[in-house]
A protein has these predicted regions:
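Residue-level signal for alpha-helical context at structural boundaries
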Residues: 22-25, 45, 75-76, 111, ...
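The conserved cystathionine-beta-synthase
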Residues: 17-35, 42, 83-101, 108
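A glycine-centered beta-loop-beta connector
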Residues: 31-34, 39-56, 97, 105-121
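Tandem CBS (Bateman) regulatory domains
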Residues: 1-13, 53-98, 118-159
Length: 159
């Protein structure tokens, strides 16, 4: 089973983070420019304070009637932040993300964010691992089937 650290590549490590005083408009522009669905909100030392997602933008800014140009991230970010460590199993993180109904998880080491994974990243890895398991089991079973079936010379004798 892959670990979270195995899933981090250059794309996941090229983290974009904003300070809490940044505006929702700045976050929306950064997400649109990078084609990402969330931004980690950090302090000066890179420690995570929260996360701002497309859903936060929609529900807490637009639907709430706030002005994205003046609304600070600290006022609309999700402060209850679920994070993962590179040593955690991808399947465990997937389960936790599904239970919490979240699609993005910051990866944290020593209190600092080193990357971000999406539910899609995690599901791809879990699927690839399960596919590999199925192929291994299939090969194992076929090995037994080959042992049980008569060899070509035995088949000739049967005819």
């Amino acid at each position: 089973m892959p670990h979270v650290g195995n899933l981090l590549d250059d794309r996941n490590r090229d983290l974009i983070a904003l300070r809490p005083e940044a505006t929702a408009m700045e976050a929306a522009q950064a997400m649109a420019d990078r084609r990402i669905g969330s931004i980690v909100v950090t302090d000066d030392d890179g420690r995570p304070l929260g996360i701002f997602t497309e859903r936060d933008l929609m529900v807490r800014v637009i639907v709430a009637g706030r002005d994205a140009r003046t609304t600070r991230l600290s006022d609309v970010m999700t402060a209850e932040l679920f994070t993962a460590h590179p040593a955690e199993k991808a399947a465990d993180v997937r389960r936790a993300m599904q239970e919490r109904h979240i699609r993005h998880v910051p990866i944290v080491v020593d209190g600092r964010v080193i990357g971000m994974l999406s539910l899609r990243d995690v599901l791809r890895a879990v699927l690839a691992d399960k596919t590999h398991e199925v192929q291994a089991i299939k090969a194992y079973i076929q090995g037994f089937e080959d042992e049980d079936s008569p060899s070509p010379s035995e088949r000739e004798r049967e005819d």
